[in-house]
Amino acid sequence: MTQQDLPQNQRFNNLDNCTDSLRQSIKILQQSNKILDETLQDSTRLTKILSTNKVFDLIPELDLNDAKSNFTKNITPQLNQQLNKLEDELIQLQTKKTTLTNKLKLINVRLKNYEKKGNKEEGGKNFNSNGLSDIDIDNLLTNRHKNGYDVNKLHQLRFLRDKKTRLQYSLNRLN
């Protein structure tokens, strides 16, 4: 049966069906195109999101072992050397601390002795307010090497003490 054999109504019906089907296909394609456009509007962000970034890079085990051996050969001795220096400095500081505490104790004992001596003499002639008499300064000068005192400082101490005594005498005369 050919198309000529079919009645005219049926032919138009088939043609209508085809056009309807074609229209529906066009609608579906338009909707698909619209959905695709909406989806692809954000494509720049999506490409950025979906792109892979290399965060970690794999290196061969030989390179890793080589880096470890270089570290142990170069860095570890330097660290040990610095650690030894710090330990030596710590020991020096501890000895210095004990030396200074012993000196402080000795000075405190001397101060107490001078205060006792001052109370006995009741402000005697050779005793000043610092607790050092002429004899004490002479003893310091003779034992300066043993105690580590500076000679110039001791002479300056004697000079200043004498100057103070003269000034006190002058003030007493004026009053």
UniProtKB/Swiss-Prot annotation:
GO terms for biological process: attachment of spindle microtubules to kinetochore; cell division; filamentous growth; mitotic sister chromatid biorientation; mitotic spindle organization; protein transport along microtubule to mitotic spindle pole body. The keyword Metal-binding does not apply. Its main location: nucleus. Residues 70-122 form a coiled coil. GO terms for cellular component: cytoplasm; DASH complex; spindle microtubule. Disruption phenotype: Cell cycle arrest in mitosis either with unseparated DNA or with unequally segregated chromosomes. Abnormal spindle morphology. Inviable. It comes from the Eukaryota. It is found in: Nucleus; Cytoplasm, Cytoskeleton, Spindle; Chromosome, Centromere, Kinetochore. Keywords: Cell cycle, Cell division, Centromere, Chromosome, Chromosome partition, Coiled coil, Cytoplasm, Cytoskeleton, Kinetochore, Microtubule, Mitosis, Nucleus. Belongs to the DASH complex SPC19 family. Component of the DASH complex that connects microtubules with kinetochores and couples microtubule depolymerisation to chromosome movement; it is involved in retrieving kinetochores to the spindle poles before their re-orientation on the spindle in early mitosis and allows microtubule depolymerization to pull chromosomes apart and resist detachment during anaphase. Component of the DASH complex consisting of ASK1, DAD1, DAD2, DAD3, DAD4, DAM1, DUO1, HSK3, SPC19 and SPC34, with a stoichiometry of one copy of each subunit per complex. Multiple DASH complexes oligomerize to form a ring that encircles spindle microtubules and organizes the rod-like NDC80 complexes of the outer kinetochore. DASH complex oligomerization strengthens microtubule attachments. On cytoplasmic microtubules, DASH complexes appear to form patches instead of rings. PANTHER family: DASH COMPLEX SUBUNIT SPC19. This is DASH complex subunit SPC19. It comes from Candida albicans (strain SC5314 / ATCC MYA-2876) (Yeast).
